[in-house]
Design a protein with these regions (language model features):
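Bacterial N-terminal signal peptides
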Residues: 13-27
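Substrate-binding and catalytic surfaces of secreted/luminal carbohydrate-active proteins
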Residues: 42-64, 69-81, 190-192, 222-230, ...
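Bacterial signal peptide processing site
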Residues: 29-31
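Boundary at the C-terminal end of the N-terminal hydrophobic targeting segment
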Residues: 37-39
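Bacterial N-terminal signal peptides that target proteins for export
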Residues: 2-17
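Short acidic/His/Gly/Ser-rich catalytic and metal-binding motifs that mark active-site loops
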Residues: 143-147, 198-205, 247-252, 294-297, ...
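N-terminal catalytic cores of secreted or lumenal carbohydrate-active enzymes
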Residues: 59-238, 270
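Residues that line or immediately flank small-molecule/substrate-binding pockets and catalytic motifs
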Residues: 97, 138, 245-246, 317-318, ...
Length: 501
């Protein structure tokens, strides 16, 4: 549902009324006030700040009365946090600025609407949810308005010197939207993935299906480097590349190609890796960029002695297999990072009856508990018809929905699942040990490196409320979470009364 901010005078009045309500009735609940999120000034060290979203969105990032640390025994559902046991450091959360997303934001919103949305998504002030990680497509994906690469030539021709390479197809939407996001959040990390090499490099001579001809391994690596250089020149530094989106899949009606482990290892180890090594602007290479069901694929590349030194991480998608594959690969190669680089919500999920907690549990809690340093959902924005797209998924959902006629914004379950982490867990935060989930209550805990704040994200997937206790050190608090809801808890260690931001 669309949630435009109230006029300032009404928000101030509402806030005053709610504060009085809390003073005169301890049980009074605050309604949603997204602009309040993160406020912690004046809170005591015994208070735990709470934000809540329910599946029906009757409360959406609602600021709730704080929980309080108090002497009490643990409840049957108990979350024990061990801050001394630390795992990966977080890079960030976000979603992909696909061609479709950028086109809608740039061409179906007024300048005021566009600025407000981008500040909300990428900023940390006011209602900002602080996305600091995004993904771009190198050429077209299914969520483009047409099929293209960045070096298309007439049928029967080739361009091994890449003389016709151009990022002009992106100058009208992807580049200005991404630059605007970076302007709001200069710390934004941008990764990029091709859906297909240019058709003339492939066995099908088409963007559709096929694989890369070995004779063009070097040209394809240079194609990716030219993309990095061209985007840097456009004011968009690329943090990381993958060689191919979903390299074990050949879609029938949109760009794609197979690229097996042997080919990826050869391109990475003998071409792309050496080309990127030693550059002033470091660009990382992530392998795989596909589902959890084939961990042997990235393992094969990481076992290659020539390719492995150039691979910094494994990129994962959620559409097959189990998230434990991330831990399987991490156990074999603990020096290689893990990222969830794509997962889409869609019409196949139970709307307002579990989709929220499914997304939060599977993609925020489970992935980070299995070593993910960053989490990316798929389309940042789609329209009311789940587009625009040229082939592929017709039922995928964006993090936000933009009305193609009015530019109005609807925030989806994916938005709130991400926001409950992205707003509070900042770059460099440590994921710390916490109890496994039980009885429908799942969690993940973090310690922010910048201000020492503690962040706990909890879902209740059950159809009734759940009461649980949380212990951190010698301190304990208890909370009752409504059915099918998601909450974030923020506090500071004893002796520190800083804010929750």
């Amino acid at each position: 549902m669309t949630r435009p901010l109230l006029p300032l005078s009404r928000r101030l009045s509402l806030r005053l009324v709610l504060c009085v309500c809390v003073l005169i009735a301890a049980g009074c609940q605050l309604t949603s006030d997204r602009s309040q999120a993160g406020a912690g000034d004046g809170k005591t060290r015994d208070e735990v700040l709470v934000w809540l979203t329910t599946s029906d969105q009757s409360r959406a990032m609602a600021t709730m009365p704080p929980a309080v640390f108090a002497a009490q025994p643990p409840l049957p559902i108990h979350i024990h946090i061990d801050e001394g046991k630390r795992y990966q450091r977080m890079l960030g959360f976000g979603a992909a600025i696909t061609d479709a997303s950028a086109w809608l934001i740039q061409h179906r919103m007024s300048p005021g609407q566009r600025d407000a949305l981008l500040r909300e998504l990428f900023g940390r002030e006011g209602a900002g949810i602080g996305f600091d990680f995004t993904r771009l497509t190198i050429g077209a994906s299914d969520f483009s308005r047409s099929h293209y690469s960045l070096d298309d030539v007439p049928a029967g021709q080739s361009d091994p010197k890449l003389d016709r390479f151009s990022i002009d197809p992106n100058r009208g939407d992807v580049i200005p939207v991404t630059r605007a996001a970076i302007g709001i959040n200069p710390q934004l990390k941008v990764m990029a993935s091709p859906w297909s090499a240019p058709g003339w490099m492939k066995t099908t001579n088409s963007l559709i299906k096929g694989t890369l001809k070995p004779v063009y391994y070097d040209a394809f690596a240079r194609y990716l480097v030219k993309y990095v250089d061209a985007y840097a020149g456009a004011g968009i530094p690329i943090f990381a590349l993958t060689l191919q989106n979903e390299p074990a899949f050949e879609p029938d009606d949109y760009p794609g190609m197979r690229l097996g482990a042997q080919a990826r290892a050869a391109i990475t180890g003998r071409h792309l890796g050496p080309m990127l090594a030693g550059r002033k602007q470091k660009v990382e290479i992530f392998d795989w960029d596909h589902n959890w069901d084939k961990p042997h694929e990235p393992l094969a590349v990481l076992h290659d002695p020539v390719a492995a030194p150039y691979v910094s991480a494994v990129a994962w998608h959620c559409y097959g297999g189990e998230v434990s594959a991330q831990s399987q690969v991490h156990a074999a190669f603990p020096d290689k990072d893990a990222y969830l680089t794509e997962c889409s919500g869609g019409d196949w999920e139970p709307v307002r009856s579990g989709g929220l907690t499914l997304q939060a549990r599977s993609l925020i809690i489970d992935t980070t508990r299995h070593w993910a340093r960053g989490v990316l959902f798929w389309n940042l924005a789609l329209d009311e018809n789940r587009g625009p797209h040229a082939g592929g998924c017709a039922t995928c959902r964006g993090v936000v929905t933009i009305d193609s006629k009015t530019g109005a914004v609807t925030r989806t379950d994916d938005y709130y699942a991400l926001a409950h982490a992205s707003r509070f867990v900042r770059r460099g935060a440590w994921r710390v040990a916490s109890s496994e989930g039980r009885d429908g209550v799942d969690n993940v805990a973090f310690v922010n490196a910048d201000d020492g704040s503690r962040v706990l994200v909890v879902t209740n997937s059950a159809t009734d409320e759940r009461r649980f206790s949380v212990a951190t050190g010698a301190r304990v608090f208890a909370y009752t979470l409504p059915a099918r809801s998601l909450a974030t808890f923020v506090w500071h260690p004893e002796g520190d009364s800083g804010t929750g931001r």
